[in-house]
Amino acid sequence: MGIGEAIAKIFAGAGASVVLLARDAERTEAARTRIGHVERTLALACDVRNREEIDRVVSLTLHHFNRIDVWINNAGHGMLDSVTNVDMAACRETFETNFFGALGAMQAVIPVMKQQGSGTIINISSVAGHIPLPFHAVYSATKFAMNAIGKGARIELKDSGINVTTVCPGYVRTAFGANAVKGTDQKQVRPASVRGISVERVANAVLQGYLKGKREVVVPWTMHPMIKLYQLFPGLVEWSMVKMAREGL
């Protein structure tokens, strides 16, 4: 189970009507079945790189449920390669999915929420949007962009009754890494001892962040000091990453 399904499950369990989106229609329907609450869930195929598809699912959601109270941008994939060797076409595709897809969805749903007078947009970003990761620099760049667009939109929309929350998980135990686009220059900069957190923990943090109207949610909490450490002493964090890359940990 990935982060998206875990979020859908916890929101459905809390009583929300939920629409699940993914490129693969069969995969989305299977997730809907596992989540349950089929009387108030909907599974739709959508490629967020295509604005017309986003507009279509927004219209279908309004047709079925009359309003959109929460929109969660979670589509994305990793990319593992060095800045020197990264394939530019793959780089652009990663930005199309991870960043421009989220931006397009925000532009599609904001007018709906403005008309309602309320709504929440939740962008699933990453700690990598605070601390750039070597050999994951393109992925980090998409998350830095996601952090900026979410926090900027939060200020712009403050008087519209629309809240924007940015969620930054650390390492999560999913197939995300295995499904990442891999180039020719790959090195590990995460110690093998780091197990990561569960998707259920991320989903609960998302729900609590929504209920509390948070500006940003970092999960696990232990990532907060790491982010502050990088902000205050970037050289120290960079040194540790260079050491891990050299040792191939």
Q: Could you say what each language-model-derived stretch is?
A:
Residues M1-S17:
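Canonical Rossmann dinucleotide-binding motif of NAD(H)/NADP(H)-dependent dehydrogenases/reductases
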Residues A25, C46-R56, M88:
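The beta1-alpha1 cofactor-binding region of Rossmann-like NAD(H)/NADP(H)-dependent oxidoreductases
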Residues S126:
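Residue(s) in the substrate-gating loop at a strand-loop-helix junction
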Residues M106, T142:
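Active-site helix of classical SDR
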Residues A14-A30:
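Conserved glycine-rich Rossmann-like NAD(P)H-binding loop of the short-chain dehydrogenase/reductase
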Residues D159-W221, W239:
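SDR active-site lid
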Residues S82-V83, D87-R92:
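Substrate-binding pocket helix/loop in short-chain dehydrogenase/reductase
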